[in-house]
UniProtKB/Swiss-Prot annotation:
Molecular function, one GO term: structural constituent of ribosome
Keyword match Ribonucleoprotein: yes
Subunit structure and binding partners: Part of the 30S ribosomal subunit. Contacts proteins S5 and S12.
InterPro entries the record matches: Ribosomal_uS8, Ribosomal_uS8_CS, Ribosomal_uS8_sf
UniProt name for this protein: Small ribosomal subunit protein uS8
GO cellular component, one term: ribosome
Presence of the UniProt keyword Ribonucleoprotein in the record: yes
Family the UniProt entry places it in: Belongs to the universal ribosomal protein uS8 family.
Family annotation (Pfam families): Ribosomal_S8
Gene that encodes the chain: rpsH
GO biological process, one term: translation
Taxonomic placement: Bacteria, Pseudomonadati, Pseudomonadota, Gammaproteobacteria, Pseudomonadales
This protein's UniProt keywords: Ribonucleoprotein, Ribosomal protein, RNA-binding, rRNA-binding
Amino acid sequence: MSMQDPLADMLTRIRNAQMAEKSVVSMPSSKLKVAVAKVLKDEGYIAGYQISSETKPLLSIELKYFEGRSVIEEVKRVSRPGLRQYKSAEDLPKVRGGLGVSIVSTNKGVMTDRAARAAGVGGEVLCTVF
């Protein structure tokens, strides 16, 4: 059976691993997942990520905790296969008054809402992280 929404699967695996207090979570890799993992690392939400390819490419994400609590409080898929969400640079959502980030897929690559606003580009709002 094929996976309908690989990015939602990635976010669910991260959410479930953090609830189970795991240190590392693995999943099938793709260019989009690696780009989202890079943004999460740059923003300080995960400790790191690694791509290994024995037979199939595998993405391993090292989760981050602070004082026993997960750094990621909430991760939510915004644009989904049944209802895509495209926003212009001015209309990009601020997550919790700017405390969280929206991850946006633009024609200049995957970036945060702040970076997209600064570059003056809009795109598909993939997910929000707080």
